[in-house]
C-alpha cells in the first residue's frame, strides 16, 4: 500500500512525520476515534497530546491520524486534536467503508483501528498504538455484528499494540475469528489474553513473546515472506490500574443489556457501551482506559525502534 501514489489533496503528512519517514526514524500511528468517541472532553484531547509526548520521550515519532476537511492527515496539530475532542460525537466515526465518502464530502472524520491502519500503511508507518481493537460483538451469532478492524488486520501490514480486544466484546469469538484469518495474536509477556480493563481472561493468545526485539523480528519475517496482514500485540494493563473482574464484568453486562433494550447497534454500540461502563464504574474505567493507552504507546515505541533498526 505504501507504494501507491496518493495526491497531496487527499493525504497530508505533517513535517514532523515527514522528517521521520525521510530519515528512517521510528514512527507510531495513533487513532482518533478514541479522541472523539472514546473519552469525554477535555480528557480526550489532553490524553491524546500526552500520549504523543510519551512516544517522543521514548525516542519515536507520534503520528495521530484523522480526516480534517476531507484530507487524510498523518500527524495532527494540537488545534486539530482539540477540535476532534470538542466536537466529540459530532465528528463522523470512519472505518474502511466510510473513508472515501467522508474524504469526498470534505468532512471531518475520526479514524477507527481499521481506517487508521489503512492510512498508516499509505504513509509507510508499520506500528500503531491504541487502547483496544474491535472484534466480534456479543450476540453476533444473531446480529453478525463484527468489527471491520478484524478484516483489516487480516489484510493490512501494520502491527497493532493494544490491551486486547475491548472487554465489552465476545473475546472467545474474537480470538477464533483472528485465528481463522491467520492474524497472529501475540501476548506481550503473557499467555493469557488481556481483557482491556483486566490483565487476564479465560482465553489464550496464539503466542507469547517477551521483548520488542522478538516482536520486530516476527514482523520482518512475516512481511518479507509475503504473508500479508497485521499482527496484534496484546499488552496487559499495568497491575496498579487494572480493574477487579467482578465489578467490571457486572458493569459491562448491564451496559450490554441496556444497549439491547435501547436498540443501539452498529458503529454506535462501542461508544455507547464504553461511556455507560464509565458511568457505572464511577469513572474508574475511564482512568484505566487512559493508563492502558499510555502503556501501549510505550511498548509500540519500543517495537517501532526495533523494527526500524532491523529494516535499516
What are the functions of these language-model segments?
Residues 198-224:
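Anionic-ligand binding region
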Residues 28-30, 62-67, 103, 109, ...:
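General beta-strand structural signal in soluble alpha/beta enzymes
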Residues 110-112, 141-154, 158-179, 212-217:
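Active-site glycine-rich loop that binds ribose-phosphate moieties when present
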Amino acid at each position: 500500500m505504501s507504494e501507491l501514489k496518493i495526491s497531496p489533496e487527499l493525504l497530508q503528512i505533517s513535517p514532523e512525520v515527514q522528517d521521520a519517514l525521510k530519515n528512517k526514524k521510528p514512527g507510531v500511528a495513533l487513532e482518533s476515534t478514541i479522541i472523539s468517541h472514546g473519552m469525554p472532553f477535555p480528557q480526550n484531547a489532553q490524553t491524546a497530546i500526552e500520549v504523543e509526548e510519551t512516544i517522543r520521550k521514548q525516542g519515536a515519532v507520534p503520528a495521530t491520524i484523522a480526516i480534517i476537511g476531507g484530507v487524510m492527515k498523518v500527524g495532527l496539530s494540537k488545534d486539530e486534536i482539540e477540535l476532534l475532542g470538542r466536537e466529540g460525537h459530532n465528528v463522523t466515526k470512519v472505518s474502511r467503508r466510510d473513508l472515501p465518502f467522508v474524504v469526498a464530502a470534505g468532512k471531518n472524520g475520526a479514524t477507527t483501528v481499521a481506517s487508521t491502519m489503512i492510512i498508516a500503511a499509505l504513509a509507510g508507518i508499520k506500528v500503531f498504538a491504541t487502547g483496544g481493537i474491535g472484534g466480534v460483538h456479543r450476540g453476533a451469532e444473531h446480529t453478525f455484528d463484527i468489527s471491520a478492524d478484524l478484516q483489516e488486520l487480516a489484510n493490512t501490514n501494520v502491527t497493532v499494540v493494544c490491551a486486547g480486544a475491548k472487554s465489552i466484546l465476545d473475546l472467545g469469538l474474537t480470538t477464533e475469528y483472528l485465528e481463522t484469518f491467520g492474524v497472529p495474536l501475540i501476548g506481550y509477556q503473557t499467555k493469557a489474553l488481556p481483557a482491556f480493563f483486566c490483565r487476564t481472561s479465560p482465553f489464550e493468545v496464539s503466542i507469547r513473546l517477551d521483548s520488542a526485539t522478538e516482536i520486530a523480528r516476527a514482523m520482518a519475517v512475516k512481511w518479507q515472506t509475503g504473508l500479508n496482514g497485521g499482527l496484534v500485540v496484546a499488552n496487559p494493563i499495568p497491575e496498579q490500574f487494572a480493574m477487579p473482574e467482578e465489578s467490571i464484568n457486572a458493569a459491562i453486562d448491564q451496559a450490554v443489556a441496556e444497549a439491547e433494550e435501547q436498540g443501539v447497534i452498529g458503529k454506535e454500540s462501542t461508544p455507547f457501551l464504553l461511556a455507560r461502563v464509565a458511568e457505572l464504574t464511577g469513572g474508574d474505567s475511564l482512568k484505566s482506559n487512559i493508563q492502558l493507552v499510555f502503556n501501549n504507546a510505550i511498548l509500540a515505541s519500543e517495537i517501532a525502534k526495533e523494527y526500524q533498526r532491523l529494516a535499516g
